[in-house]
């Protein structure tokens, strides 16, 4: 193939135990040669991933300062597992709660 494989599974799970998550939702995306998968907008997800240059921490942004989140701990973990541009990827990030997750992923097309 002329394209390096890019096939990922993205999940949002309750809790902070990556080894045994309680998955709330999961989607798949394959970006080469065309965007497809179970993700609601695979084209936008592929564009967001491509913009990271493979550094998935770049999916995170400074939390929106106009959004106030409660200070309770109900951890939510997002993860990306699969192959991105020919390299195996296993990335995750845990947030204090779903509000903090939404504020930090503000406008992100992946999760």
UniProtKB/Swiss-Prot annotation:
A cellular component term, taken from the record's GO annotations: extracellular region
Principal localisation: secreted
InterPro entries per record: Prot_inh_I16_SSI (IPR000691), Prot_inh_SSI_I16_CS (IPR020054), Subtilisin_inhibitor (IPR023549), Subtilisin_inhibitor-like_sf (IPR036819)
UniProt keyword annotations, A-Z: Disulfide bond, Protease inhibitor, Secreted, Serine protease inhibitor
Disulfide bond sites: 31-46, 69-99
UniProt-annotated location(s): Secreted
GO molecular function, one term: serine-type endopeptidase inhibitor activity
Site feature: Reactive bond: 71-72
Subunit record text: Homodimer.
Family from the record: Belongs to the protease inhibitor I16 (SSI) family.
Its biological purpose: Inhibitor of subtilisin and chymotrypsin.
Name the record gives this protein: Subtilisin inhibitor-like protein 8
Organism for this UniProt entry: Streptomyces virginiae
């Amino acid at each position: 193939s002329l394209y390096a494989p890019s096939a990922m599974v993205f999940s949002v799970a309750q809790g902070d135990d990556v080894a045994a998550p309680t998955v709330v939702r999961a989607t798949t995306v394959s970006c080469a040669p065309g965007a497809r998968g179970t993700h609601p907008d695979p084209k936008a997800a592929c564009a967001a991933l491509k913009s990271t240059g493979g550094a998935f921490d770049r999916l995170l942004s400074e939390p929106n300062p106009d959004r106030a989140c409660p200070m309770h701990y109900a951890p939510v973990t997002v993860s990306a597992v699969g192959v991105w541009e020919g390299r195996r990827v296993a990335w995750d990030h845990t947030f204090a709660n779903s509000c903090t997750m939404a504020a930090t992923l503000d406008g992100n097309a992946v999760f």
